[in-house]
Amino acid sequence: MESIWRIATGQDPSREDYEGIEFWSNPERSGWLTKQGDYIKTWRRRWFVLKRGKLLWFKDQAAAGIRGSTPRGVISVGDCLTVKGAEDVVNKPFAFELSSGSYTMFFIADNEKEKEEWINSIGRSIVQHSRSVTDSEVLDYDHRR
């Protein structure tokens, strides 16, 4: 599981953060996003993969397609609380943020459609993998609709 310490210190993810996730095969969503650095607030374009409750990023698309490659970073979306637009926060078009109780990460998509698709995909993953919602509560919610 991704630790807040690892995010805060910028350390590479450990293998246990993404062990058992075949990120190179059939991701729920993948594509280019520009991510703001944690300490030096520069923007870097990275290839992102969303799969099984993990948001992983790589230097490029080729690295994400290789079995056994190491992601540049991993976020467990089940630990996150919100994903929403953030154009007004970072003053850039197509920006969105992913937040937990202790950190916020900012991303920029290539266009409005991509931004909305990432927000929707990550939002679904947060709900599916959140530790605050039990399986029975999800089933209960589905039956009440």
Swiss-Prot record:
This protein's name: Pleckstrin homology domain-containing protein 1
SMART domains: PH (SM00233)
CDD domains: PH_AtPH1 (cd13276)
One protein family per Pfam: PH
Chaperone keyword on record: no
GO molecular function: phosphatidylinositol-3-phosphate binding
UniProt-annotated location(s): Cytoplasm
Record note on quaternary structure: Binds PtdIns3P.
Role, per record: Binds specifically to phosphatidylinositol 3-phosphate (PtdIns3P), but not to other phosphoinositides.
GO CC annotations, alphabetized: peroxisome
Domain of life: Eukaryota
Signal peptide location: none
Biological source species: Arabidopsis thaliana (Mouse-ear cress)
Keyword Cytoplasm in annotation: yes
Region annotation (Binds specifically PtdIns3P) ranges: 29-53
Tissue: Ubiquitously expressed.
InterPro entries the UniProt entry points to: PH-like_dom_sf, PH_domain, PI-Interact_SigTrans_Reg
PH domain residues: 26-127
UniProtKB keywords: Cytoplasm, Lipid-binding
